[in-house]
Amino acid sequence: MLFSQIVATSRDVGATRSRKVKVGALREVLIQLEPAEVEPVVAWLSGELRQGRIGIGWRTLGDIPATPADVPAVTVSDLDGTVTAVAGISGSGSAARRRKLLADLFARTTADERDFLLRLLTGDLRQGALEGVMTDAIAAAADLPVEPVRRAFMLSGRLPATAVAAFDGGVDALTAFRLEVGRPVRPMLASPAESLTDAWTELGGDVSVEYKLDGARIQVHRNGDDVHVFTRTLREITGSVPELVELVAGLPCTSAVFDGETLALTDSGRPRPFQETMSRFGAESARDLLLHPYFFDCLHLDGVDLLDAPLEERLAALERVAPQHRIPGLIRPDSDGAATHFDDALAAGHEGVMVKSLAAPYAAGRRGRAWQKVKPEHTLDLVVLGAEWGYGRRTGYLSNLHLGARDPDGGEPIMVGKTFKGLTDALLQWQTDEFPRHERDRDDHTVYLHPDLVVEIELDGVQVSTRYPGGLALRFARVLRYRPDKTAAEADTIDAVRALLPG
């Protein structure tokens, strides 16, 4: 298949808000692929290379020919082979050899192909929250039910591998995907609750009520003496958190997978600001800042997979091996006990509580009602769509944020409001320095961004409004913090915003 067909499909998918049309366009290209083309094409249409990040930046791409080709000629095989070759180059003179291979490739690309390829190679290709749409398209193209495709993806964390299995082996190949210790699974997610009473009542009181910490999500895998730690986006951070590795290696088990949070504490035991915890995950780790783990789930223990077991059984497994590192929680409290636990969580400096169904399995990668988060104020994780230049004291700074909610059908985020409230001088400076790196377009007043950055917004409520495309507007929105641990695909949906409407 010609690479130009992939570029055209990407353009068509990005041009529509209709989930049905997106799935149809992706299916149409998938059914035309040769077996060897499935893995790279699914990766590209998901905004990544099947080889992973290969260390290519704008400096390496500085020698590409100035004039694009007139006629499409590059095939999927050509491109994938070149990327594989570039990824394998190392040693003396490697930079020059990489540039030569890429220059030869770009000399054969058209203008549209070149734009797509530049963004793909530099990690700058924004495909939106396409994972769910691509999963549906794979199922449609392979003529399979959607659910086994979704489950295989959640367990593998890799859409290209899931697609290959679907086309090569059907349902049998997909059901062969299992939880593999050492390979992260996509985390189960919670939905916001209107109140503690609503969550407790909806789940029938057969619940675990746990502290909701202001920490960073972690997934820890242990196999013998081998321990790996991953973030909520499945990025490995093992080398940055030796204290967590040492702690889990010392637990009384031979193999385990734990889900939880980690955070830094003050000398008095209260949580430090979220940004301080996240600083440990960077390349320049602040090693003097000790992280503490708080686990709330056990997905595997000593050879037994527990994903499909009810939460009550998973909590019992966690209690057997890590009782001192469990997140504070109550099993089947009455309504008064749940309320007291909520108050205790807030008094300890935490965000609120999670209310979880004790009967629910672990729905990897899914956001449902089996887990509900309760906070004292409404908060939403929204996508930053742009920022306006400030005036007065904020002249010269990017200030007023344009905020969008995720489209559950995989379209572009839907704008629901603006705010500059809550922005400190430090955040204003950071935005002004950082936002141009994500710039999509600009005019005299506003810098428009690719949907990369997620910000946590506190608000008093939501009202119906014709001012924004979603028909909703945030009331008294203010910035709490940025969420570098979250992608746009994990932002709250327009449905979650709509659920906050009164009545």
Curated annotation (Swiss-Prot):
Residues where ATP binds: E210, R217, R232, E261, F296, R367, K373
- Pfam families found in the cross-reference section: DNA_ligase_A_C, DNA_ligase_A_M, DNA_ligase_A_N
Looking up CDD domains in the UniProt record yields: Adenylation_DNA_ligase_Arch_LigB
One GO molecular-function annotation for this sequence? DNA ligase (ATP) activity
Entry's Gene Ontology BP terms: cell division; DNA biosynthetic process; DNA recombination; DNA repair; DNA replication
What reaction is this protein's catalytic activity? ATP + (deoxyribonucleotide)n-3'-hydroxyl + 5'-phospho-(deoxyribonucleotide)m = (deoxyribonucleotide)n+m + AMP + diphosphate
Q: What class of enzyme is it?
A: ligase
Return the PROSITE patterns for the record: DNA_LIGASE_A1, DNA_LIGASE_A3
Q: Which UniProt keywords apply?
A: ATP-binding, Cell cycle, Cell division, DNA damage, DNA recombination, DNA repair, DNA replication, Ligase, Magnesium, Metal-binding, Nucleotide-binding
* Active site: residue positions: K212
EC number(s) per UniProt?
6.5.1.1
| Keyword Magnesium among record annotations | yes
Q: Which PANTHER family match?
A: DNA LIGASE 1/3 FAMILY MEMBER (PTHR45674), DNA LIGASE-RELATED (PTHR45674:SF13)
Protein function: DNA ligase that seals nicks in double-stranded DNA during DNA replication, DNA recombination and DNA repair.
Q: Which family does it belong to?
A: Belongs to the ATP-dependent DNA ligase family.
Q: What is this protein called?
A: Probable DNA ligase
From which source organism is this entry? Rhodococcus jostii (strain RHA1)
Its lineage reads: Bacteria, Bacillati, Actinomycetota, Actinomycetes, Mycobacteriales
Report which gene this protein is encoded by: lig
